[in-house]
Amino acid sequence: MRNDPFQRLGLDREVLTVSQLNQRARLLLEDVFPQVWVEGELSNLARPASGHVYFTLKDSNAQIRCALFRQNALRVRQALRDGLAVKVRGKISLFEGRGDYQLIADTVEPAGDGALRLAFEALKEKLAGEGLFASERKRPLPAHPRRIGIVSSPSGAVIRDIISVFRRRAPQVELTLVPTAVQGREAVAQIVRALQLADRQGFDALILARGGGSLEDLWCFNEEAVARAVAACATPIVSAVGHETDVSISDFVADVRAPTPSAAAELLAPNAGDLQQRLDGLRRRLVLRMRDQLLRERLRLEGVARRLRHPGERLRQQAQRLDDLDMRLRRAFERHLAVRHERLVRLETRLAAQHPGRTLALLRQKLDSLAARLPRAAREVLKDRRQHLEGLAQTLNVVSPLATLGRGYSILLDERGRAIRDAGQTQPGQRLKARLAEGELEVRVEDNHRTPVTLSLLD
């Protein structure tokens, strides 16, 4: 009897109001479940202006309403959202006004995938803050790759799917597998080493691929070491991890995210039909460009032709211009002659009014007198000059060396034509010239005393 809660409440003999029933039920629940941990998934999350948080905690079979009051909500560090798996600590209670059974929570912690998702969001926020997800870092994929490296597990359907796509779409592309574990404790270190090795091989692009799986299975692609290894690759890289709904940190860091490994292969495998279609499009664009260019050049040529007149036309215009200039020159010359003639007439009129007849007659008489005296004066001057010249000639003849030579003397000249005035200027055997009044003699010095020089004629 003691353990019968209904008997303790007196429900076997007492009729209660609804309020009394709800109150007693609340007290009973709070007494039996003073504190409990419950695990489930968040849904129907609501945040009114009061600061309280209301949500539903559910699993696959049941659900319970929860209330997290403001003072406790402020202590919850992780961001709450629908779908997050959590562990909630609190006490079971009942809202008497509606009779709703609920959990009054005081602590909310991530549970299972929830903890992983919180770690995912924390790392995502950190790397985004460093700029590793920035679009400026994203490199374009090569349009026509020749060598592609595949960082993935050597077993499984992933590598076969990738090879199948390339064989069908671009068999000319060389594929190289860089093997690595994609799950387990060693996966992170192996993926980092495989990425570093592949980046040194000179591939045109890399594919980081893994098939689908749970969040725990794919977690190695959410590790910071793998994310930084992807970011450090100098080779453009496509991340293809899991199924289309799976998103990993490596997807954000890579240059391109593909929803599946096969989709990654299609991104890098140029389809022959697509290439032909692209070439056809380029050919059409080229033809249109050429037509437009030809049309522009034709219009430009026509414009130049309109501006460039025929040489004959230019000659006719120049001839017409020359005729016009000739006529203008003639008219100007005639006007100039008329002006000059008019001025000359005026000058003649003025000259006739001031004719110097008497002055000219006197000047003419004076001129005639001077003309008569000029020949006589000229003869007198010429006679005086001739007499003076004859006197000078006589004086010159007296002092002339030629006159001395005429009296039997001679002038001795050395080889340089210099006159010999002293015997000391000669040497025995020296040849000299003796200039006479008539002709010259070649002589040789026999001796050169200060006494008269002895000369001998050369044979």
Curated annotation (Swiss-Prot):
GO molecular function, one term: exodeoxyribonuclease VII activity
Keywords carried by this UniProt record: Cytoplasm, Exonuclease, Hydrolase, Nuclease
EC number annotated for this UniProt entry: 3.1.11.6
Catalytic activity line of the entry: Exonucleolytic cleavage in either 5'- to 3'- or 3'- to 5'-direction to yield nucleoside 5'-phosphates
Subunit structure, as described in the record: Heterooligomer composed of large and small subunits.
Entry-linked HAMAP family: Exonuc_7_L
Protein name: Exodeoxyribonuclease 7 large subunit
Encoding gene (name): xseA
